[in-house]
Structures are given as C-alpha cells and as structure tokens.
Amino acid sequence: SIPFFGLVFFYRNAFSNKLQIRNIPFFKILIISFCWSWTCCAVPQLVSNSIFNWNITFITFIYVFAITIPFDIRDMAIDKKKIYTIPQFTGAGVAFIISQLSILCLFFFALFHSNHLLCFFMIMTNLVLIPSLKIKSEFYYLFVLDGLLVIFPIFVS
C-alpha cells in the first residue's frame, strides 16, 4: 500500500514545475483505477492469505476505469488547464464510447466465465451510463454512479 500512497502523494503535490506527475496524459484515471482495485481487491486477498484472484482485481480495475470516464466528461471544463484526461484528448463522445466498450468487454469476460449475475450488472451499468453525456446533476454522479461502485462487489464473485 505504501507505493500507492506515494503515487497519490506525488500526483497531488508538485515539487517541480518541470516534472509533475499530473501532467502525464491519462494518468489520473490509471491512478484511480489502480488504487481502487488495489485497495478493494488485492489488499483484502493478501491480508486474508487466500489464493490471489487476478480476475477480480482485473474486473475491478476495468470497471472503475469505465465509471470514472463520465466524471472526467463532467469535469472537462474544470480539468482543462490542470489535468489531461481522456475526454480532453478524444472529446466527450469518443470518451463515452471508450467507457461503454470497457463495460462491454467486462460483459463478455463475465459471459466467458459464466458469471451471469455480473453480465446482468454490466448491462445495468451500460444503461445507467447512457445519460452521463447530458446529465450534470451532482445527484446523478454522487448517488447513481458512485452507488454503482458501492453495489458492484455484490455482483463480482
């Protein structure tokens, strides 16, 4: 966990104008995805001395990646001069498609592993993400999208 703490610390605090981690394109979403998958999947598995399941960690990483893109689309105006995100490089429409394709990949991954409950959840997630291009309400982002992350573990097995 210490390397991830260091990564987040150095991302947030710039010690030099020339070398700022946050200026590396797409790094924000990777940090968020890595930290969530590490904290929610890898650490509990390591602490419990169970057999490490890379599939759950991989699924969580991709899922958090896909769910984070709508937040980046919403924050495009705020991040414009500070942080380089996928929507700034590709535009909101292409970023949205990347998010949808990520969820679709997880759907097929779950289907391949006969996890029908996760398939159902990926379909529900895609449907919930559709309004993210138009809705800018804090309620939608705070309760609906973040709520998906809260109930996500129920469907991953």
PLM segments and residue spans:
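Intramembrane alpha-helical segments
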Residues: 1-47, 128-131
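Functional transmembrane core segments of multi-pass inner-membrane proteins
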Residues: 25, 29-70, 76
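Small-residue-rich segments of transmembrane alpha-helices in multi-pass membrane proteins
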Residues: 25-43, 88-96, 143-157
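Helix-coil boundary and interhelical linker segments in multi-pass alpha-helical membrane proteins
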Residues: 1, 38-58, 108-117, 155-157
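Transmembrane helix-loop-helix
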Residues: 1-16, 51, 97-144
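A cytosolic-side transmembrane-helix exit/cap motif
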Residues: 18-27, 73-83, 135-147
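Solvent-exposed interhelical
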Residues: 64-102
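Generic secondary-structure boundary signal with a strong preference for alpha-helix termini
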Residues: 40, 45-47, 84-87, 103
